[in-house]
Design a protein with these regions (language model features):
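Basic, Gly/Ser/Thr-rich N-terminal segments that form RNA-phosphate-binding interfaces in CRISPR RAMP
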Residues: 1-264
Length: 264
């Protein structure tokens, strides 16, 4: 019971912690580094898990079972540049993929670039082996408040280490948190100086790949997906419609009316 109380306090502290330190993005922008660029995307429900494979030392039954990625300098939850680079590289052909699958990935990249004659293998090498730099992604503090984290409980039903169907405690970034995705990019040019794929085209490509494929752990069950716009919250809809008729409990009748219509 004592351990349970301690763990609950720790978990509550994680959930309620308010981040006050700004990310380094504003400083990067102010430096006006050659090739620096960024774009913003919002996490979608149920949120973002990143760095779950990081080492975590607590072994108690109800302790958080997986690690997480926190920036060493600011303490902010973030997507490391290496993770961002790896996730984007996985969207390109090669790296052990079957030939048929690689061809599909190549066609997908060409379609996003709207360039049928681009050499995807050369583009891949130029992006991931040469000059382009992946700085990572940092949350925008104050966009939806300063509380960024929530607890997530997953109940596996598999054999092995977690064979008992007991909930596993994990950390996630909340839905509706805006992230800055940051890069230093350069144009890809032919020998005569003709631009084949510009830095701006790369930026748009990366943005669409993240929107399509997601980022982080458990994307196949909904985590790690982003959108360009923050979803409208139900409470915001309620505020924008103050004249709706409420029932005797102070609750809107709108949902009940829809339910009743559905039963007819």
């Amino acid at each position: 019971e004592e351990n349970d109380s301690i763990l609950k306090q720790h978990n509550d502290a994680i959930r309620d912690f308010s981040f006050k330190i700004a990310s380094p993005v504003e400083k990067w922008r102010a430096l006006q580094m050659k090739g620096y660029t960024d774009f913003q995307l919002c996490t979608q429900y149920p949120g973002l898990m990143i760095g779950t494979g990081n080492e975590h030392s607590l072994k108690m039954d109800d302790a958080i079972k997986c690690g997480f990625s926190f920036d060493y300098t600011t303490g902010l939850p973030y997507i490391p540049g290496s993770s961002l680079k790896g996730a984007l590289r996985a969207c390109f052909p090669g790296d052990g993929k079957k030939e048929e699958i690689s061809q599909e990935y190549a066609a997908y990249i060409r379609a996003l670039l709207d360039k049928e004659d681009v050499d995807i293998e050369q583009l891949k090498e130029n992006i991931f082996e040469n000059r382009d730099i992946f700085l990572g992604a940092f949350p925008v503090i104050g966009f939806t408040g300063k509380k960024l984290l929530e607890m997530e409980f997953i109940t596996p039903h598999t054999s092995g280490r977690f064979k008992n169907p007991n909930p596993i405690s994990q950390i996630k970034v909340r839905p509706d948190v805006k992230f800055d995705f940051c890069f230093i990019l350069s144009d890809d040019c032919s020998e005569d100086g003709t631009v084949i794929v510009s830095a701006e085209e790369k930026k748009k490509l990366f943005k669409q790949l993240i929107l399509d494929m997601g980022m982080g752990a458990k994307t196949h069950v909904g985590f790690g997906h982003f959108s360009e716009r923050r979803p409208i919250q139900l409470r915001e809809i309620a505020v924008s419609q103050p004249n709706r008729t409420n029932n005797r409990y102070g609750q809107s009748n709108r949902g009940q009316n829809q339910y009743n219509r559905g039963r007819r």
